[in-house]
């Protein structure tokens, strides 16, 4: 489905597999994506289908059900249900479980290369372990941060009291996927100007006039901005490199 899971599938399959991503344009809003007839047809020839699950548009579920493809649903590998936070690739547990599920699916579909898939799985987990070690070294209380959209899990932490007191309206509107009121926006801008927020995390795929106001206020207040996305940006070739780069960006933002 989305390209970050396609990159994991490629890493785990090596030269033995051919991976086709359904969503290839990184500027497309994944929540609103509607599959074309060509997209559905691709599932008909697949032996393994990897989809995100949770609230992210269930394109893969709909298209893969009539086929014989083994379906790997990333969210479900960690017990995340439909309606939960869909940005599951930020979770180490989901990444690890999904990788193992993909490997098992490959070994079932192509048993003659079972050992190859086991070796690639081991190599992938070694890289994932390096990423988790990097995150562990960074994960500590770095001060208040407010997110523009609910993308969590990479560097989790509590939301400090100053954040709740000064920007609760905006944060609540974002959590409910509704638009903040003018008063909420002003409160947030004032919070940024007052120096209560040390870092602003922004979903670049949901940019609009409201976020422009907030990011503008953050820049004016010299608050570091870290951009996240719901699909892996073009400059990265695999999910783990993208996650590692984000950790570097967070580290630079809080120096």
Positions of the model-derived regions?
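Extracytoplasmic metal-acquisition and chelation regions
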Residues: 1-255
């Amino acid at each position: 489905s989305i390209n970050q899971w396609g990159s994991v599938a490629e890493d785990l399959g090596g030269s033995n597999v051919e991976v086709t991503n359904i969503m290839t344009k990184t500027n497309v809003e994944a929540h609103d994506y509607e599959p074309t007839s060509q997209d559905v047809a691709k599932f008909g020839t697949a032996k393994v289908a990897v989809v995100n699950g949770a609230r992210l548009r269930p394109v893969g579920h709909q298209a893969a059900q009539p086929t014989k493809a083994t379906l790997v649903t990333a969210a479900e590998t960690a017990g995340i249900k439909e309606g939960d936070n869909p940005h599951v690739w930020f979770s180490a547990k989901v990444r690890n479980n999904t990788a193992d599920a993909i490997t098992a699916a490959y070994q079932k579909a192509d048993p003659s290369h079972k050992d190859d898939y086991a070796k690639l799985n081991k190599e992938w987990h070694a890289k994932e372990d390096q990423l988790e070690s990097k995150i562990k070294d960074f994960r500590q209380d770095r001060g208040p941060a407010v997110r523009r959209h609910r993308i969590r899990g990479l560097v989790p932490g509590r939301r400090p009291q100053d954040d709740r007191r000064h920007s609760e309206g905006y944060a609540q509107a974002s959590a409910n996927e509704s638009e903040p009121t003018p008063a909420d926006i002003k409160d947030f801008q004032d919070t940024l100007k007052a120096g209560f927020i040390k870092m602003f995390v922004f979903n670049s795929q949901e940019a609009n006039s409201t976020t422009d106001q907030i990011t503008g206020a953050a820049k004016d207040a010299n608050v570091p901005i870290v951009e996240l996305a719901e699909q892996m940006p073009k400059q990265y070739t695999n999910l783990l490199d993208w996650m590692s780069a984000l950790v570097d960006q967070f580290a630079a933002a809080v120096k």
